[in-house]
């Protein structure tokens, strides 16, 4: 029996605002517990929320970037439930009329492109955080309570764990490029809820779905879904029935574990939020936001390939983040060769950032200085080997590469009039190497070049050295 898989993803993205969705409390990651709150977050009687217009605008920005239809007149709803991290006993969200509907993203898996539909996007407030400690007590931190979120709900178009991974990566890139969110799973600004069901091919109705929790990375999402897919198939093949469950991914055991069985759908008793007015979105507001959106990563990738001849893989790496993409474009705008700029960013720059665990904006390197160094290589002022010394300087200090090269005497020696006497001296002292080369031992030329580079402290231009060396050997 063959099966088909259906996967649904609900992605919560934390919007990058200075204050919360319905209160003036600050939004700052990593602060002491319960220091970023006020009476609205705590749900004190008589206090009234107010809508953060900036947060809603960021939500519209995300919706437009995902090709969604923006709802022109909507309202907020109360989702009623009790939990320690929700002191109001309800969450303000959008149920009946979400911010946007009918969006889509295009993914690519194994060279094949596919559109994944987005059913809806809605803006809501986040809950606080329960912390279970070793002393036997559970504590509540409400710093996160009220943080603005946009929830992105996929249509049932995802049919494999690989597609789910590609969808999340594409979604992360698109949202990150808008600037609406940092979308960092490690900081909680992007969280994923998943559900999966399988059914025999040809069956009209969907199978029974299970939810999977504790998915803290895209790799965990992919691996957890892959395990659950096989588990459900095995249950059906053995004649059993899949139960509606919530399961937890164990990354060490590489399996999902039962948390609880769900007997029916949750009843949150939604009703319109009485303390907030409706939200009217004008066409001008939508148009202004649309005009402010940057070129999306997919279009940038294609432009890099077509306009600058960047290989497809490299173009994909350069557009992983808007910061890297903008830096690359700015470097080229400063006159650097596009392929050389790409190579340096993907190689030495990325290597340094990964080794130091920092981001591009946290180092001293500027597009102008990187372009300046690439020009010095291109015109022969410095060698590729010297460039690595220059790079270490300009990525750690705000240093002009041209000025620094001249101050340190690192200019490449390319003048034949200065190189020829040095080469002649080396040849005079190494007749055996000349004889070996003429006898067909090509490695002898490498020895001679090495001696010349040693004599010039690595500053001789290897290309010019080889030209003079071959000419001099022929005359001997």
Swiss-Prot record:
The keyword Ligase applies. Keywords: ATP-binding, Ligase, Nucleotide-binding, Protein biosynthesis. The keyword Ligase applies. SUPFAM superfamilies: GatB/YqeY motif, Glutamine synthetase/guanido kinase. It catalyses: L-glutamyl-tRNA(Gln) + L-glutamine + ATP + H2O = L-glutaminyl-tRNA(Gln) + L-glutamate + ADP + phosphate + H(+); L-aspartyl-tRNA(Asn) + L-glutamine + ATP + H2O = L-asparaginyl-tRNA(Asn) + L-glutamate + ADP + phosphate + 2 H(+). One of its GO terms (molecular function) is asparaginyl-tRNA synthase (glutamine-hydrolyzing) activity. It holds the Pfam family GatB_Yqey. Its EC number is 6.3.5.-. It is an enzyme of class 6 (ligase). Signal peptide: none annotated. GO terms for biological process: glutaminyl-tRNAGln biosynthesis via transamidation; translation. Allows the formation of correctly charged Asn-tRNA(Asn) or Gln-tRNA(Gln) through the transamidation of misacylated Asp-tRNA(Asn) or Glu-tRNA(Gln) in organisms which lack either or both of asparaginyl-tRNA or glutaminyl-tRNA synthetases. The reaction takes place in the presence of glutamine and ATP through an activated phospho-Asp-tRNA(Asn) or phospho-Glu-tRNA(Gln). Heterotrimer of A, B and C subunits. Belongs to the GatB/GatE family. GatB subfamily. HAMAP family: GatB. This is Aspartyl/glutamyl-tRNA(Asn/Gln) amidotransferase subunit B.
